[in-house]
């Protein structure tokens, strides 16, 4: 429930200056009121007519104007004055109440224009308080129903919040699983790539090793073939030289006899030395 806002009530200047005086009725009406017969007061009715000069005990102060021989109707002006005063006071009260009501209504209308929400809340609170006074059981039932509806709404909100939290947790778990699976797949791919590279390097090394082995296997055969060829060449050269030495000294003019020079003997020595190397090949380290 919202707090009640008490609004100040200011009286108009006409009311704040003093009590309002009722408008005096016209002279004709006053005369008519005087002419109309009024009922005698109780004191005047009970006054004995046999003793006109005596005043009853206890009423000397009120009826001091009574004189011997005067009629009982002299009490009427005093009664009329009292009635007029009472009527004037009642009219003043009514007029004041009306003015206050009007001023209050004006103030409420102004407040409604200035503060419509507060005024509505005040009206609702007033209506509820009145309803509680008039229909307490119904108000209690309404309050219980409102409380139950509020509790239901709170329960529903809590359930919705729980469901949302569960959904968020499930989504987060799913995302984490996906990330973990992606990381695992990436790791597997990297391992496969590394294994493939290792296999390729291993195969390449094996091929290179095979080529080296083949080359090493071929080298001794080449080495043995080369000395044999050299030996054949040396033998051919020796045969040619021997044939040249056995030829006659006299040859046709066209053929010139070529004597072996000193520089040609050295190759023969070198050939013999090479033959020895072929027969005794050096040891492989």
Swiss-Prot record:
Q: How does it assemble?
A: Directly or indirectly cross-linked to cornifelin (CNFN).
- Organism superkingdom: Eukaryota
**What subcellular locations does the record give?**
Cytoplasm
Q: Could you tell me what this protein is called?
A: Involucrin
One Pfam family from the UniProt entry? Involucrin_N
Would the keyword Cytoplasm turn up in this protein's UniProt record? yes
What biological function has been recorded for the protein in this entry? Part of the insoluble cornified cell envelope (CE) of stratified squamous epithelia.
InterPro entries, per the entry? Involucrin_CS (IPR019743), Involucrin_N (IPR019571)
Q: Which GO terms describe its biological process?
A: keratinization
Q: Where is the composition biased (Basic and acidic residues)?
A: 149-165, 175-185, 200-233, 272-285
Q: Where is the composition biased (Polar residues)?
A: 27-39
Q: Which organism is it from?
A: Canis lupus familiaris (Dog)
Could you tell me the keywords of this UniProt record?
A: Cytoplasm, Keratinization, Repeat
Q: Which family does it belong to?
A: Belongs to the involucrin family.
Tissue expression remark: Keratinocytes of epidermis and other stratified squamous epithelia.
Q: How this protein is processed and modified after translation, per its record?
A: Substrate of transglutaminase. Specific glutamines or lysines are cross-linked to keratins, desmoplakin and to inter involucrin molecules.
Chain intervals with Low complexity compositional bias: 72-87, 120-129, 137-147, 235-248
What's a GO cellular component annotated to this UniProt protein? cytoplasm
């Amino acid at each position: 429930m919202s707090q009640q806002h008490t609004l100040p009530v200011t009286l108009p200047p006409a009311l704040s200056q003093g009590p309002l005086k009722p408008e005096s009725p016209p002279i004709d009406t006053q005369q008519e009121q005087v002419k109309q017969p009024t009922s005698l007061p109780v004191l005047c009715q009970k006054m004995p007519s046999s003793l006109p000069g005596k005043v009853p005990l206890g009423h000397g102060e009120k009826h001091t104007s009574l004189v011997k021989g005067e009629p009982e109707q002299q009490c009427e002006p005093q009664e009329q004055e009292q009635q007029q005063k009472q009527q004037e006071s009642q009219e003043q009260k009514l007029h004041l109440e009306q003015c206050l009501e009007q001023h209050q209504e004006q103030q409420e209308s102004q407040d409604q224009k200035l503060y419509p929400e507060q005024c509505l809340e005040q009206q609702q609170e007033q209506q509820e308080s009145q309803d509680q006074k008039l229909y307490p059981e119904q108000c209690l039932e309404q309050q219980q129903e409102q409380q139950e509806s509020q509790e239901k709404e709170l329960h529903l909100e809590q359930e919705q919040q729980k469901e949302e939290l569960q959904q968020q947790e499930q989504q987060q778990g799913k995302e984490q699983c996906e990330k973990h699976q992606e990381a695992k797949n990436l790791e597997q791919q990297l391992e496969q790539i590394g294994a493939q590279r290792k296999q390729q390097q291993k195969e390449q090394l094996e091929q290179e090793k095979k080529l080296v082995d083949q080359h090493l296997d071929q080298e001794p055969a080449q080495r043995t073939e080369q000395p044999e060829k050299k030996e054949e060449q040396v033998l051919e050269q020796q045969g040619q030289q021997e044939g040249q030495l056995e030829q006659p000294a006299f040859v046709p003019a066209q053929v010139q006899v070529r004597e072996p020079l000193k520089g040609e003997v050295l190759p023969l020595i070198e050939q013999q030395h090479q033959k020895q190397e072929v027969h005794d090949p050096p040891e492989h380290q």
